[in-house]
């Protein structure tokens, strides 16, 4: 009996010691994480387009702020933004953050590819992120989106709402990421009616609204009644021209990009819909993994419809029921892979409209990127 008592007592003491040790270790891990979280610093380098461009740059900034709020971070303390109008400026700013040992350094946009590739090779102990670009380096994560898929849905919506059978596309520049929008959009229009004409114009700039107005005026003057703008701050000029025409009694529409641009069409109400990217999701995932010590350098993340990373805006005020039904049907078919949206000229030239399969298609959990 006495022997049995000592056995039980010994087991109890060992168990208690083990639990105390585990609790202490967990507390230490939690304390270490909290300390790291408080001191975490992010450097963000943007191009010459303003942060409040009401489009891509603002979508990125809003995503970083959203993550910051989750961690009680303060602007200028935990996350800092600087502008880099030129490639030389970009390299200088990226290097500055690396030398100051910032935890993550973001370069925003396709134009930062060369600068990040060069600085990441020199500053190998620093971790970099490029949004809307690809840099294949072991200390760089590339966040990209399947823009062609959301653009395809925008094409479906445009084709179902045009009265003139003439639709416009205004791009900022002819880089591969903007061309994805163009080819996806044209494929969507073609899937509804191959006879509809899509007229394309490029501004060769992302920061001149007056150029956007000029191109929009030209397209609307050619009997185009819907324009899909993918031109950053330049695209705001498309809204300006559309609102001007709406005031004069002409019914025209604009399709926004990257974030819900419904407000940009007010008060004249000219935003048909917007092709959005969930930039906040991509940004949050990379920051969270870095915080947990799991920065996945070398990965190229691709967010598409399957990953709930792109689509049309939730605001459907200006889309009729038939349009919403068709958009949802095509979206479901892209999700399952029944419809493969073209993202370049070669794919587009070989694209043939596919009749969507009907019926409810369940969402599946998937891994993002490679």
Residue ranges and their predicted role:
Residues 24-370:
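A residue-level marker of the well-folded mature domains of exported/periplasmic proteins
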Residues 17-21:
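C-terminal motif of bacterial Sec signal peptides marking the signal peptidase cleavage site
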């Amino acid at each position: 009996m006495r022997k049995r008592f000592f056995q039980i007592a010994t087991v109890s003491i060992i168990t208690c010691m083990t639990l105390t040790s585990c609790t202490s270790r967990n507390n230490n891990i939690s304390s270490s994480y909290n300390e790291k979280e408080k001191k975490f610093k992010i450097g963000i380098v943007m191009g010459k387009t303003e942060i409040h461009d009401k489009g891509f740059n603002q979508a990125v900034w809003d995503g970083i702020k959203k993550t910051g709020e989750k961690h009680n971070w303060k602007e200028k303390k935990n996350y800092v933004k600087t502008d880099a109008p030129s490639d030389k400026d970009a390299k200088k700013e990226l290097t500055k953050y690396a030398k100051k040992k910032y935890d993550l350094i973001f370069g925003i946009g396709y134009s930062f590819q060369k600068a990040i590739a060069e600085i990441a090779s020199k500053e190998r102990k620093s971790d970099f992120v490029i949004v809307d670009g690809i840099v294949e380096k072991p200390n760089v994560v590339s966040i990209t989106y399947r823009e062609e898929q959301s653009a395809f849905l925008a094409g479906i919506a445009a084709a179902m709402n045009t009265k003139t059978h003439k639709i416009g596309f205004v791009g900022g520049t002819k880089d591969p990421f903007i061309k994805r929008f163009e080819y996806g959009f044209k494929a969507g229009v073609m899937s509804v009616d191959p006879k509809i004409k899509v007229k394309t114009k490029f501004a060769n700039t992302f920061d001149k609204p007056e150029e956007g107005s000029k191109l929009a005026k030209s397209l609307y003057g050619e009997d185009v009644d819907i324009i899909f703008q993918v031109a950053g701050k330049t695209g705001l000029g498309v809204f300006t021209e559309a609102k001007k025409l709406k005031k004069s009694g002409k019914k025209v529409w604009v399709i926004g990009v990257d974030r819900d641009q419904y407000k940009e069409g007010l008060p004249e109400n000219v935003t048909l819909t917007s092709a959005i990217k969930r930039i906040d999701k991509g940004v949050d995932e990379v920051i969270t993994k870095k915080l947990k010590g799991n920065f996945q350098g070398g990965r190229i993340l691709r967010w598409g419809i399957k990953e709930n990373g792109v689509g049309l805006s939730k605001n459907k005020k200006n889309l009729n029921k038939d349009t919403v039904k068709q958009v949802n049907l095509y979206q479901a078919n892209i999700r399952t892979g029944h419809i493969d949206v073209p993202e370049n000229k070669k794919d587009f030239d070989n694209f043939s409209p596919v009749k969507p399969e009907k019926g409810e298609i369940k969402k599946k959990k998937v891994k993002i990127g490679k």
